[in-house]
Amino acid sequence: MIERGKFRSLTLINWNGFFARTFDLDELVTTLSGGNGAGKSTTMAAFVTALIPDLTLLHFRNTTEAGATSGSRDKGLHGKLKAGVCYSMLDTINSRHQRVVVGVRLQQVAGRDRKVDIKPFAIQGLPMSVQPTQLVTETLNERQARVLPLNELKDKLEAMEGVQFKQFNSITDYHSLMFDLGIIARRLRSASDRSKFYRLIEASLYGGISSAITRSLRDYLLPENSGVRKAFQDMEAALRENRMTLEAIRVTQSDRDLFKHLISEATNYVAADYMRHANERRVHLDKALEFRRELHTSRQQLAAEQYKHVDMARELAEHNGAEGDLEADYQAASDHLNLVQTALRQQEKIERYEADLDELQIRLEEQNEVVAEAIERQEENEARAEAAELEVDELKSQLADYQQALDVQQTRAIQYNQAIAALNRAKELCHLPDLTADSAAEWLETFQAKELEATEKMLSLEQKMSMAQTAHSQFEQAYQLVVAINGPLARNEAWDVARELLREGVDQRHLAEQVQPLRMRLSELEQRLREQQEAERLLADFCKRQGKNFDIDELEALHQELEARIASLSDSVSNAREERMALRQEQEQLQSRIQSLMQRAPVWLAAQNSLNQLSEQCGEEFTSSQDVTEFLQQLLEREREAIVERDEVGARKNAVDEEIERLSQPGGSEDQRLNALAERFGGVLLSEIYDDVSLEDAPYFSALYGPSRHAIVVPDLSQVTEHLEGLTDCPEDLYLIEGDPQSFDDSVFSVDELEKAVVVKIADRQWRYSRFPEVPLFGRAARESRIESLHAEREVLSERFATLSFDVQKIQRLHQAFSRFIGSHLAVAFESDPEAEIRQLNSRRVELERALSNHENDNQQQRIQFEQAKEGVTALNRILPRLNLLADDSLADRVDEIRERLDEAQEAARFVQQFGNQLAKLEPIVSVLQSDPEQFEQLKEDYAYSQQMQRDARQQAFALTEVVQRRAHFSYSDSAEMLSGNSDLNEKLRERLEQAEAERTRAREALRGHAAQLNQYNQVLASLKSSYDTKKELLNDLQRELQDIGVRADSGAEERARIRRDELHAQLSNNRSRRNQLEKALTFCEAEMDNLTRKLRKLERDYFEMREQVVTAKAGWCAVMRMVKDNGVERRLHRRELAYLSADDLRSMSDKALGALRLAVADNEHLRDVLRMSEDPKRPERKIQFFVAVYQHLRERIRQDIIRTDDPVEAIEQMEIELSRLTEELTSREQKLAISSRSVANIIRKTIQREQNRIRMLNQGLQNVSFGQVNSVRLNVNVRETHAMLLDVLSEQHEQHQDLFNSNRLTFSEALAKLYQRLNPQIDMGQRTPQTIGEELLDYRNYLEMEVEVNRGSDGWLRAESGALSTGEAIGTGMSILVMVVQSWEDESRRLRGKDISPCRLLFLDEAARLDARSIATLFELCERLQMQLIIAAPENISPEKGTTYKLVRKVFQNTEHVHVVGLRGFAPQLPETLPGSDEAPSQAS
């Protein structure tokens, strides 16, 4: 029987009232009695402080301020201490008889916050003779002692042999030691556990039913099923880890894709740039050589063009000099032709205008006579019409206003006065003072006759004037002709000069007739002279081109020599053309073949790369397609063998997994049906009862029970009989054993133990011999040992399976690679190397190009000679027909003589042309120049006087006519007669009006008709005058212009001038054409020279730049090559198939890869920076650095424990295989890890059933507890309805909710929470997450409802509440609950500590006087039965006959307070022993 640990004593050092006091504690009840302020609460506060040194929990309520809403700052501890170092120590002895002193060092902290500093410590190995007070105090004299600080205490204890001192920095470590040594009943791992322990102590200290405990009885009484929860958590953690691993694999697969993408794009980016630089370097070298060849050729061409330019410039200067003379001659000929044409046109105009003027003169004279007659008739018609109009107006006015007619006398008086005025005017004009109205008519006839006579006289003078004017105009015309021909002269000299001019005109006309024959002769000679000059020019040009002077006699022989040379060169050129065509044809064939090979080369190179990779992977060399197919067959055989071995290993691994799963079942049941049957029968599996069997005892018990090791232990077999009827879902052999599962032992059988075997006597006539199994599986330790060995075997099998899977996938990938190679490259992989053939063809092409170049040079020289010979023959063909002209030396003298004679004839022709018409007009009228008509002015004066007389006579006749017309007005002197005859007057007026209107109409018609006719006559006259004046003026202008021209226009002049101009134009055109040809040729030559010069400078610059670039690039390229070889990436970068792409394609490829790489390395700062630096086109080595950095980056991410290679490309291939295998393995592992919902329900139900049985056992211990009217106390445990429904669904209807448990997105806890919400939609889950709710649902305690019930009087069983019980009953009931909690904690912790330790049990009860004697006796009995220590505080002694009683009295001595303590140890025959008193110390009431 294991003894229970006990608290031996409590020691207070330097507390208020207690300087150094040790209270020995009774094994059962220790009573502290005393009045108010005696120090009872201080003593228990010191005990609690040493037990739970947590300032966040300690709160002694009897020292709080009254009525305050918050506690005291020091929470009752600061005021209980004295200044300086204080101690509270507990002296204990545990079940192992080990003395352990635990305590705390306390010290007040200065400040108004009233804080206390606590340091927990423990002392082990202290001898029993040493008292706690001796450890922490030092005696100074008989009445003085000093409290040792903690460091001195430590030094003091370290000096003692075998004593261990431990100081703790955390309360958790302090409580952990106390738990391990059996001082406290429960392991306090966290602040929550400490809080529960403190609440329990606090509830016992102050008594009553603690609501804090009763509300959370599940947390206090029901142990946390940490194993089940840990199993669930491990399962979920494993599933979570599995899923995270799968997700990591998926991420790794994406990383693998990223790695592949990164390697692919980095290779494309760097290899494209690498090959582009390699191609550019080769191209630059070729260009440098080509520039050098072109430079040499261009220099030769420039020298040839310079020689050619000098020759053409000299010839052009000669043509420019000749062109100036030709232009002057041509311009003079053109001007002469224009003058001749102008003179001819002028002469034609003059003749046409003179004829028109004669005709207009006649028409003008006739029209003047017609107009004069029309004017006279017009005047008469106007007078007649005016009189008729006046009379009509007067009659109308009279008829329109009859009253006016009555007043006509006044009007007639006016008319009468007007008539008198007209009469007076006529008298004045006609000089007739005796003129009257009656005689006016007679005088009118007289004056009309006089007017007619004056008109006839004027007409006679006018006729004479016209005749005189005609004679005068002929003289003036002849005089003007003489002046026009000879110039200004006197009128009397005109006759002599005119006769001289007519004689000179005859001589000049004779000379003018010789112009045409002379001109024709001159034209012929000039033509021969020009041909002679052209022949001389052609001969000089020919000699200059030939570079030698030739005589005329040598030209024919030279002509024959040149024709023979042309025939020979023509044959050579023809043969050269055929040879050049053959060479070019061969060159084109070579180029076509090279292009074909260049197109085939990338395919062949890709096939070779693939073949090399296959060779590296398999370590074989392939020389033909047959080797490839044979190796593929070998691969298939190896794959088949590897798959068979992998499947065998996989089957064994699955068997091991199944065995591990079977052995991992809770309770050791290998058959799930046994768990269900045990729950159904209300029993426990035998394997679960013996679950704690050690590994050494496992073989014995396994052999002891034999086949019945999987039996079910039931309390009563008779109650199971009814369940066995119709039972089918069970193992073939089901063993049932009757017994108490709580106290089951192996006394069921009679056993004889042998060597490694047992003999079990089942019955008198039936024995069973069982050997100890080599691998026992009975008990948790044996199963764990077996599981451990199975796990080791599984690790080996898993590693072997992984290796085989890797090998299989590697072989499969190799097989796929061979299949791809056969499908894509086998047809071309073993063909001849196209690059070698390309190199041979390029060599031949260079030879052909060199031969073509030499052939072109030779052909060019022959063509130049051929062209020169053709030009010489052409020139000789033009020279030879003119040899006779070249021999004529007198041709130029004859031309000059004929030209002088032609000049004289042309001068005479110009005189005739200029004055021929004047002389022709002068000749018929030259006789009128003999006399000058001087009487012409007198005749003009007589004609003017006659006109004036005719006008005066006309005015006189008009004045008399007016008088005659107004004769009627003279009779208006008397108007009386008009007033008496009104009606007659009206009638007469009407008759007169009609007559007057008719007369007026006739006068108007006559006037209108004659006016229109007169207007037409005047218009015709004005038109004739205008035409005559215009033509006269134009004629004078034309005559002046003809004189200004100074050229005589005859019929042949224009033709001769045109012929001369055309000849000069032809010469000028030929000269200009040749000059233009030379200028164009010279310009072209200059342009060609400029182009050649620029080309030469450009070629020199390009050549030197290219050479410098080649030299510079060589250094950079050497650095790149050195970096490539040092890092071993040449095989990756030197991709020969890229050499056949253009620079633009490679740059585009690199740019595309760069864009992809920027996205790929966006999250990697190092690679991003290196990539940014590599973008510098002037530093190609940085791209190599980037490629190396990428490879290094990928190498660092290769797991060397899985992938054993440094090559990232190979690593990626191995990674694909490994990730595929891991994915498959983890998927199967997830399926095995997943626990079924039915298993969860069974585990929770089994746990609930076990705890219900345990609570039932606890209730048995409380059946006899009674306090007052309370006869019994018990705990009631029920399963919540909502949770019971959840368990039913999990076990029976889980198929309906597999959508939750099969979801990869939900953990089991989340799926359980979702199911709970689905079943109980009315419950508000608040802000809690499904994971939190699920974890709560995995804790069986949340399925139970617990409450405390009391059997009180006649009320029966009631819920234990403070309001329904008396104070004493509540204290007793609360104490019973606390005892149950402590006992439950011990049961829960039994598995965690050593089995040889039974922890201390101690509770408090302050103010115990509220209990009666019976209740006190019940407490004492309870403590005795449960081996529990109890500390009671009361004002008076309570049952001093039992336990130990301390009497505390606070006394004042010399202004100091101290507590006097007297201890009694029960009632005995001997006198009560007085315990040592306390030291004095100043204190305040506690």
From Swiss-Prot:
Disulfide bonds: none annotated. The keyword Nucleotide-binding applies. One of its GO terms (cellular component) is nucleoid. It is found in: Cytoplasm, Nucleoid. Residues 326-418, 444-480, 509-603, 835-923, 977-1115, 1209-1266 form a coiled coil. The keyword Metal-binding does not apply. Its main location: cytoplasm. Residues 666-783 are annotated as: Flexible hinge. Keywords: ATP-binding, Cell cycle, Cell division, Chromosome partition, Coiled coil, Cytoplasm, DNA condensation, DNA-binding, Nucleotide-binding. GO terms for biological process: cell division; chromosome condensation; chromosome segregation; DNA replication. ATP binds at residues 34-41. InterPro entries: MukB (IPR012090), MukB/SMC (IPR050308), MukB_hinge (IPR032520), MukB_hinge_sf (IPR042501), MukB_N_dom (IPR007406), P-loop_NTPase (IPR027417). GO terms for molecular function: ATP binding; DNA binding. Plays a central role in chromosome condensation, segregation and cell cycle progression. Functions as a homodimer, which is essential for chromosome partition. Involved in negative DNA supercoiling in vivo, and by this means organize and compact chromosomes. May achieve or facilitate chromosome segregation by condensation DNA from both sides of a centrally located replisome during cell division. Homodimerization via its hinge domain. Binds to DNA via its C-terminal region. Interacts, and probably forms a ternary complex, with MukE and MukF via its C-terminal region. The complex formation is stimulated by calcium or magnesium. Interacts with tubulin-related protein FtsZ. HAMAP family: MukB. The hinge domain, which separates the large intramolecular coiled coil regions, allows the homodimerization, forming a V-shaped homodimer. Belongs to the SMC family. MukB subfamily. This is Chromosome partition protein MukB. It comes from Escherichia coli O127:H6 (strain E2348/69 / EPEC). The lineage of its organism: Bacteria, Pseudomonadati, Pseudomonadota, Gammaproteobacteria, Enterobacterales. The gene is mukB.
